[in-house]
From Swiss-Prot:
<comment type="function">
    <text>Receptor for arginine vasopressin. The activity of this receptor is mediated by G proteins which activate a phosphatidyl-inositol-calcium second messenger system.</text>
</comment>
<dbReference type="InterPro" id="IPR001817">
    <property type="entry name" value="Vasoprsn_rcpt"/>
</dbReference>
<dbReference type="GO" id="GO:0007204">
    <property type="term" value="P:positive regulation of cytosolic calcium ion concentration"/>
</dbReference>
<feature type="region of interest" description="Disordered">
    <location>
        <begin position="398"/>
        <end position="417"/>
    </location>
</feature>
<dbReference type="GO" id="GO:0005794">
    <property type="term" value="C:Golgi apparatus"/>
</dbReference>
<dbReference type="GO" id="GO:0005768">
    <property type="term" value="C:endosome"/>
</dbReference>
<comment type="function">
    <text>(Microbial infection) During SARS coronavirus-2/SARS-CoV-2 infection, may recognize and internalize the complex formed by AVP/Arg-vasopressin, SARS-CoV-2 spike protein and secreted ACE2 through DNM2/dynamin 2-dependent endocytosis.</text>
</comment>
<keyword id="KW-0812">Transmembrane</keyword>
<feature type="transmembrane region" description="Helical; Name=6">
    <location>
        <begin position="284"/>
        <end position="303"/>
    </location>
</feature>
<feature type="transmembrane region" description="Helical; Name=5">
    <location>
        <begin position="202"/>
        <end position="222"/>
    </location>
</feature>
<keyword id="KW-0325">Glycoprotein</keyword>
<dbReference type="GO" id="GO:0150104">
    <property type="term" value="P:transport across blood-brain barrier"/>
</dbReference>
<dbReference type="GO" id="GO:0001992">
    <property type="term" value="P:regulation of systemic arterial blood pressure by vasopressin"/>
</dbReference>
<feature type="transmembrane region" description="Helical; Name=7">
    <location>
        <begin position="322"/>
        <end position="341"/>
    </location>
</feature>
<keyword id="KW-1003">Cell membrane</keyword>
<feature type="transmembrane region" description="Helical; Name=4">
    <location>
        <begin position="152"/>
        <end position="173"/>
    </location>
</feature>
<keyword id="KW-1133">Transmembrane helix</keyword>
Length: 424
């Protein structure tokens, strides 16, 4: 399979879309470049498949204890696994055989699934970011376990991906590379000279430009909300004389002074939990990885169809190969980002190494109410009694738990109070 875009149209070297002005179809390829690509694709396939399967198996063991964030991570891992199996694997096999080996129906199905996995992965990331936006900026709407709105957010990316990928079925077919040559390959026929430019521009907007714009807007609002929350905490600290004196809640005058003039969604929940901020950081890193991996791919593709002077020789082919491989790397990055933020998702051997290499956890003292006190983390852990939940409370600078963050508040802060030893 060629290493160019998933909607290749012109019979150029390696079948890329980078040479709309090419006049002579090529029947050969750069074998050395193909060998390098095959090796890289095989590595990407192993890493993406292994990493995402590890995440799926770990989350699958939680059963009904899965939180909202668990569901989004699970489905994002599914979309990345789809990229590995429906995009990377066919591309690897196609590079090995050079020409497409299969009937016309298989040609159309492969092209459809390749773009579907790209749409699904992008839109699932967007849905997860929207969920984090709602959790931070509209917390009262998210004080619940996975509900109808959550499942709608998860189903929408799959549905949109299935619809937006349909043009692939009609554009691609098994056709002769050169009329009368008898050499067949899975190529596109747009019907109009402007077809490749229009289709590629629309796909770039739908998969990259518009989603990145929405992701940027969401994170701008999230950062703004967190800054306002920090302002509330700072004002409360100053009004309270530099710290909370007892386990009791701050006085009504303190709360009134610190929340006056702020939106109700900020004053209704006095703090954004550390676990929630951690999930925001994780999603933000995933977004950065997505942009870093796919920006070169779409930049080169747009350059090839909009610049008549774009190179159409070997240099362009190398650039297309590198850009396409960078896009595939995104499916490798995501599962390791999950595991980096959540050590419990690591496979057991890696988890053991992480435990041996890291600092030993502090001893926790059991409080009279059965909760656990720790100075560093806010974790929900399940005790030996199935019906009992013990909560580790983070302490303030004065060494005492935050009075306004009761165990119940922390459980409900992200709508994920039944999770087991997790940060989301």
């Amino acid at each position: 399979m060629d290493s160019g875009p998933l909607w290749d149209a012109n019979p150029t070297p390696r079948g890329t879309l980078s040479a709309p002005n090419a006049t002579t179809p090529w029947l050969g390829r750069d074998e050395e470049l193909a060998k390098v690509e095959i090796g890289v694709l095989a590595t990407v396939l192993v890493l993406a498949t292994g990493g995402n399967l590890a995440v799926l198996l770990t989350l699958g063991q939680l059963g009904r204890k899965r939180s909202r964030m668990h569901l989004f991570v699970l489905h994002l891992a599914l979309t990345d696994l789809a990229v590995a199996l429906f995009q990377v694997l066919p591309q690897l096999l196609w590079d090995i055989t050079y020409r497409f080996q299969g009937p016309d129906l298989l040609c159309r199905a492969v092209k459809y699934l390749q773009v579907l996995s790209m749409f699904a992965s992008t839109y699932m990331l967007l849905a997860m970011t929207l969920d984090r936006y709602l959790a931070v900026c509209h917390p009262l709407r998210s004080l619940q376990q996975p509900g109808q709105s959550t499942y709608l957010l998860i189903a929408a990316p799959w549905l949109l991906a299935a619809i937006f990928s349909l043009p692939q079925v009609f554009i691609f077919s098994l056709r002769e590379v050169i009329q009368g040559s008898g050499v067949l390959d899975c190529w596109a026929d747009f019907g109009f000279p402007w077809g490749p430019r229009a289709y590629l521009t629309w796909t770039t907007l739908a998969i990259f430009v518009l989603p990145v714009t929405m992701l940027t807007a969401c994170y701008s609002l999230i950062c703004h909300e967190i800054c306002k929350n920090l302002k509330v905490k700072t004002q409360a600290w100053r009004v309270g004389g530099g710290g909370w004196r007892t386990w009791d809640r701050p006085s009504p005058s303190t709360l009134a002074a610190t929340t006056r003039g702020l939106p109700s969604r900020v004053s209704s929940i006095n703090t954004i939990s550390r676990a929630k901020i951690r999930t925001v950081k994780m999603t933000f890193v995933i977004v950065l990885a997505y942009i870093a991996c796919w920006a070169p791919f779409f930049s080169v593709q747009m350059w090839s169809v909009w610049d008549k002077n774009a190179p159409d020789e070997d240099s362009t082919n190398v650039a297309f190969t590198i850009s396409m491989l960078l896009g595939n790397l995104n499916s490798c990055c995501n599962p390791w980002i999950y595991m980096g933020f959540n050590s419990h998702l690591l496979p057991r051997p890696l988890r053991h190494l992480a435990c041996c290499g890291g600092p030993q956890p502090r001893m926790r003292r059991r409080l009279s109410d059965g909760s656990l006190s720790s100075r560093h983390t806010t974790l929900l852990t399940r005790s030996s009694c199935p019906a009992t939940l013990s909560l580790s409370l983070s302490l303030t600078l004065s060494g005492r738990p935050r009075p306004e963050e009761s165990p119940r508040d922390l459980e409900l802060a992200d709508g994920e109070g039944t999770a087991e030893t997790i940060i989301f």
